[in-house]
Amino acid sequence: MNAPHTPHLNEADAAAAVEANAAEIGRRALTRREQKEAYENNKLFKRLVRQVGQAIGDYNMIEHGDKVMVCLSGGKDSYALLDILLRLRERAPIDFDLVAVNLDQKQPGFPEHVLPEYLTKIGVPFHIENQDTYSIVKRLVPEGKTTCSLCSRLRRGILYRVAGELGATKIALGHHRDDIVQTLLLNMFYGGKLKGMPPKLQSDDGKNIVIRPLAYAKETDLEKYAELREFPIIPCNLCGSQPNLKRAEMKALIRDWDKRFPGRVDNMFNALANVVPSHLMDTQLFPFAGLRATGEADPNGDIAFDEDPCGTGASAPGGAKSVSIVQFDDL
């Protein structure tokens, strides 16, 4: 009787098996990597939505019946602002409207089709304001000098006017945590002021309320979010203006601190909401001249000879008082 035939695995079959096994391992690794990326992306989205919702609640930025004019420049921050406000509106317990506004300043090479196409695609009402401020700035500012200051003033006046024409009750800007800290440092280093960039303010013409819903968001998170959402970014160097070197210096400083000293920038930001006027030097904020010993203990009194305890970390803006306009359990 013949012995049963045992098939032999030749070299080609063995190589194919190895390749198949390697491909399967690679597929599983890719799946795990994709799962991790999806998890991190979801965390990023939830974090940004939570931060924007908290900022809105802490400062009562948006109220029932508001019409919010979102200033859209084509940069990552304003795109993210509009995108997150749209998502928040779906879950908010109040009703409010959004309208996107872009000021086309007629810089050479500005891709004027990008924003209308994007906003039409996502179904957001919008208004494009065409004003040739570029020519005005170029005519008035000497060659080689930065045009940012004059350009900003012209842009601000136009946007305030447009807000009135559209019936907007709030004007939303895309400034974030890093912008606020940069402004604080710029005013300290170059202006001799303790002055930041408030999350909510009355405009200088007294007719508008300006809000910054991204106040609690980090720029690095917004960069990742813009990449994830694939926003059609319009470059910000079209005007050919000299860069704001002082602000760029502050930005680099903050990025460096974030890497080398985790938590430092967060504490600086939190300090803006934990001010002790009696321990500063502004006589307009605290009546130093009339200060007298009362004979009663004061919990806010100065220890005088002891070092003030530090390193415990400041509580975040809003603290326990924060009220969110959205529930996050279903995100």
UniProtKB/Swiss-Prot annotation:
Q: Where is this motif: PP-loop motif?
A: 73-78
E.C. number? 2.8.1.-
- Does the keyword section mention tRNA-binding? yes
The protein's matches in Gene3D superfamilies, at most eight in alphabetical order, are given as:
HUPs (3.40.50.620)
Q: Which GO terms describe its biological process?
A: tRNA thio-modification
Q: Which organism is it from?
A: Burkholderia thailandensis (strain ATCC 700388 / DSM 13276 / CCUG 48851 / CIP 106301 / E264)
Q: What is this protein called?
A: tRNA-cytidine(32) 2-sulfurtransferase
HAMAP family per the record?
TtcA
Q: Domain of life here?
A: Bacteria
Function of the molecule: Catalyzes the ATP-dependent 2-thiolation of cytidine in position 32 of tRNA, to form 2-thiocytidine (s(2)C32). The sulfur atoms are provided by the cysteine/cysteine desulfurase (IscS) system.
Residues forming coiled coils? none
